[in-house]
Amino acid sequence: MHESPILSNGDQPNRWAGLNRRVAALLLALIGFYRTFISPLLGPRCRFTPTCSAYGLEAIQRHGPWRGGWLTLKRVLRCHPFTPCGCDPVPD
């Protein structure tokens, strides 16, 4: 049986951590861009509390870029006129 390259090489976890930080920074920057430049043009449209962009920021900060990004994508796809409004916090 062979060892996983992530576990056998001490540098691998640092590479993954660096990648995760870069992906998280990119996602947070995209949300910041949306909040600064696009959202003011569109006006308030989100059906949920917190707003989808606030949800995305919190989800990525709490759960990291991969799970937080997935939760954010699912939330944005639920934000349409056929979904009831309401409170939809980031899950633990």
Curated annotation (Swiss-Prot):
Subcellular location: Cell inner membrane
Record-linked InterPro entries: Membr_insert_effic_factor_YidD (IPR002696)
Taxonomic superkingdom: Bacteria
Membrane topology label: Peripheral membrane protein
Matches recorded under Pfam families: YidD (PF01809)
Key words of the record: Cell inner membrane, Cell membrane, Membrane
Disulphide bridges, residue numbers: none
Family membership: Belongs to the UPF0161 family.
Function of the protein: Could be involved in insertion of integral membrane proteins into the membrane.
Protein known as: Putative membrane protein insertion efficiency factor
Organism placement in taxonomy: Bacteria, Bacillati, Cyanobacteriota, Cyanophyceae, Synechococcales
